[in-house]
Amino acid sequence: MATMNRRQFLIRGGATLAGAAVALPFADTLLAAGRTNSAAHHTAAGTGFPGSLLDELSAIVADLETKFPYATARFIATGGVSISRDRKGKRVSESGSPTLGVSIRIFDGASFHETAVGSASPQALHAAAAALKRTTPRAADRYRIERLPYLQQTWRTVMERDPAALPLADRAALLDQEFARCNWDDPRVRSVRVSTDIVETQRVFVDRTRRLASVSTMLSHTGFMFGFDKGKPGFGFRRHVGQAGLELAHLNDADIEKLRKDFVESLSTEPVPAGEYEVVFAPEVSGLLAHESFGHGVEMDQFVKDRAKSREFLNKPVASKLVTLLDDPSVAGARGSYAFDDEGATSQPTIIIKDGIFVQPLTDLMSATFLGTPRTPNGRTQSWDRKVYARMSNTFFARGTSDPKELLASLKDGLYLEGFRNGIEDPQGWGIQFTAGTAREVKGGKFTGRIFAPPTITGYVPEILGNITMVGNDFVLEPGSCGKGYKEFVAVTSGGPHLRTKAKVS
């Protein structure tokens, strides 16, 4: 079977339990089955599952397509372990609730229909598929589904230190040592916590031309400090997140120093005087702008519902000519990366804005089909029992040519914003609001020592992007989670270089 190495982030291979506490059932079977075209059924030892899940799902798809023009099946299972250590002791628990299920989807010629089963039992899957087939009439053909080229492939996260190779007790002991390094006897500190969360996700997608499987390991390692000074709360926070192994599960001396420094500085922040400022965004704030401005606003399911003003600006200027913005699920090891989306499209970069021109929205299969546009690998779901939507992955501004020090030196009277908290956008009106961690006062290109928190930026998307006058040559991605409105959460990153612009801050 052919191998695929997408920026060295995923490789073909078998699966091992990343969490060491929650056994996901079919990893070895899935990846082994993905290496052959054989339709022969077999029993996977130790799973109680009779035969290849890939073969079962392929048979279901083939049967549904005797009536409908297009059918798919996707399997998702997640499980993991969380270890934490604070001043009260140590805790080991499941990381979230283990989940497992299959979604079966059909296109009747005019619209999509779907059913989901919280099981991988062949009997349950075939029964659900039969009911969907029986109760859904075949419609007249109004749209044509794009068939992707044939591909049968498996992937697995690249790791330098596989968590499965280190017993859970040894990992807990390492966390004890790190807690001792992070703990601080400053009387203002009330709580210190370090934690490691590891989640393994198995994913399968099957349609007539695709049999895809992946096993990914997501690790999040966090240090947190909280306390008070004269009634004012303060905190420090450092974390390493990505699709990787235990090589990420470590805070170095610089991380711990930054954790303590951020805690101390947060105790002396003041509210920012509201006004319009010349500003420089640190990469994580640039990413928040990217995510909220030309992330949600160009998810193309909003075009179908006529809920996105960006639809009026396709192939038109929306930003400074210095701005190029991308979404790329193939970035090596990033939290928002994946080998293929939940509709079988393999990962590749999508240029959303090029030299200030809005050139391509993010699509799922439904929006691309109904609007007749090029398809991007952005059809994503939160879990096996949720709908697929057009979603971001890793969304960021491309590097520019300016040294970040030049951006700061150019500020005669302004703010340097860093850290991020949250954001929201109105796709219909194209208003945006997001909150950074802190804003440092800058005069004459130098910090004055005044720190404001939390600064909130508001404005009209094309105006903020159009005001960008300098783009740094650095690049950083920050991990996060993204909801579709108030629900449908998926893993993402956002970032880019430093940016200089003008914005309303309060």
What residue ranges belong to the model's regions?
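N-terminal small-residue-enriched
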Residues: 2-6, 10-506
